[in-house]
Design a protein with these regions (language model features):
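A conserved glycine-rich beta-strand in the N-terminal activation segment of trypsin-fold
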Residues: 49-50, 86-92, 107-129, 154-159, ...
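Catalytic histidine site
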Residues: 56-68, 109-141, 188, 369
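N-terminal activation segment of mature serine protease catalytic domains
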Residues: 63-118, 132, 169, 192, ...
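Interdomain regulatory linker/hinge segments that flank or connect interaction modules
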Residues: 65-83, 224-227, 277-328
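Catalytic-histidine neighborhood of serine endopeptidases
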Residues: 68-72, 124, 131-166, 177-179
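Active-site loop architecture of trypsin-fold serine endopeptidases
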Residues: 110-115, 134-143, 180, 200-214, ...
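PDZ/PDZ-like groove recognition
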Residues: 115, 251-252, 256, 305, ...
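Active-site substrate-binding loop(s) of clan PA
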Residues: 159-161, 178-207, 214, 298, ...
């Protein structure tokens, strides 16, 4: 995890901010506010399907000297939906307004590092889902302080309920003074490439930021750094560290996702959750690179399955096939494409062994997901709950075979 040291003015203590969050402390206190004539505004705090509203610009919190003053300002200036022109609103306004009350900003702090991320409200009594890498500092969730700012501006301490590094998800909980607004989940198996989506979160600390785009691709598999690795950061792809990567099955979107969006919402045109933002691709080597229009989100159905497990038991279970696999290539040439997951070894007594899968078999499908490389099979299996029955299709000696297997 690449950390950027930032020294607070008036203090010898240095805080190392995870570059995932791209935060720098202000050099001095903000200037005294000048009195200005306040324009008349219409504010709405509740959205219905026929409401027409415009999202206002909300500034995120800064970290560093003067943080106490800024925090006080924020408690008196909560995020708000501002209506400026009822005749010029659109679906983005409607969708983001429906979902925004269910998106929170998360502050994480340890002894030597700190950062910000986003989260999605699961229940009215305070359960919130985010990325495991958001609640992890220096490769650990131990001794990490968590705070949550709600959509209406109140700040609450949070406790970690459980984390699932395998799917880069975690659940935290706050004790709020009033019921939270749970996010409405869409069925992520029903979305299409080309569907319009909105990303909501706190990129660079700018809370309640909304960006629009489309679903660029489905059933992608990416490799990201494990949240358990102190030398790697979240949001970015795996860079070849000593710990194995995490293989995630994700939705690809061109909605702008930046550091601080991690754990935030990707919603459809109805304001329903289709995914939790988790990673971005970048062109440069800098850890502070921003969006290039290639972002990724964990599908809502996976988020619900994992978060339900964590709330119920404090942990999440995963399917296990019981095979050692590698990519099956289309040819022996250097220009070959991967065409499936080649079984190198079968674990005796494991799920694959019980149904007769053999070394040399090539897995090409799991349920409705086509498998073209080993990482896709790994992510597909691990997204399933332990004990789930799935259908697997393999190639053996030129013939296709289909098996039902309990993971």
């Amino acid at each position: 995890m690449t950390n950027k040291p930032v020294e607070r003015q008036g203090s010898s203590r240095k805080l190392s901010y995870n570059s995932q969050f791209l935060f720098d402390g202000p050099a001095e206190l903000p200037p005294k506010k000048q009195k200005v004539k306040k324009a008349k505004e219409k504010r709405l705090t509740f959205f219905t399907a026929t409401s027409a509203i415009m999202l206002g610009v909300i500034l995120g919190a800064s970290i560093g000297s003067g943080a106490g003053v800024l925090a006080q300002n924020y408690l008196t200036r909560p995020p708000a939906i501002i209506v400026n022109n009822l005749e010029s609103v659109n679906w983005v306004t409607a969708a983001s307004s429906a979902a925004a009350p269910s998106v929170v900003t998360i502050r994480v702090a340890g002894q030597n590092s700190a950062g910000n991320g986003s989260g999605v409200v699961l229940t009215s009594d305070g359960y919130i889902v985010t990325n495991a890498h958001v609640v992890t500092l220096d490769g650990s969730t131990a001794d990490v302080g968590l705070s949550v700012r709600t959509n209406w501006g109140e700040v609450f301490p949070a406790k970690l309920i459980g984390a699932d590094p395998t799917n880069d998800l975690a659940v935290i909980k706050i004790e709020s003074t009033k019921p939270l607004t749970p996010m409405v989940f869409a069925d992520s198996t029903k979305i299409n490439v080309g569907d319009q989506v909105v990303a909501i979160g706190a990129p660079l600390g700018f809370e309640a930021t909304v960006t629009r785009g489309i679903v660029s691709a489905l059933n992608r598999t990416i490799q990201v750094a494990s949240s358990e690795n102190p030398d790697e950061q979240g949001l970015q792809f795996w860079s070849g560290s000593s710990l194995p990567p995490v293989n995630l099955g994700v939705i690809q979107t061109d909605a702008a996702i930046n550091p601080g969006n991690s754990g935030g919402a990707l919603v459809n045109d109805k304001g329903e959750l289709v995914g939790v933002n988790v990673a971005i691709a970048k062109t440069g080597s800098s850890a502070e690179s921003g969006s290039i229009g290639v972002g990724f989100a964990i599908p809502a159905n996976v988020v619900k399955r994992v978060s339900d497990d964590i709330i119920a038991t404090g942990t999440a279970t995963h399917g296990v096939l019981g095979v050692l696999i590698t990519d099956s290539m289309s040819s022996d040439s250097g220009s070959a494409f991967p065409v499936g997951a080649l079984v190198v070894e079968v674990t005796p007594g494991g799920a694959a062994d019980k149904i007769g899968i053999l070394a040399g078999d090539v897995v090409v499908r799991l349920n409705d997901k086509l498998i073209t490389k080993s990482s896709e099979l790994t992510s597909a299996v691990r997204q399933e709950r332990k004990g789930t029955m799935v259908e697997i299709e393999i190639l053996r000696d030129g013939s296709k075979l289909v098996f039902d297997v309990v993971l």
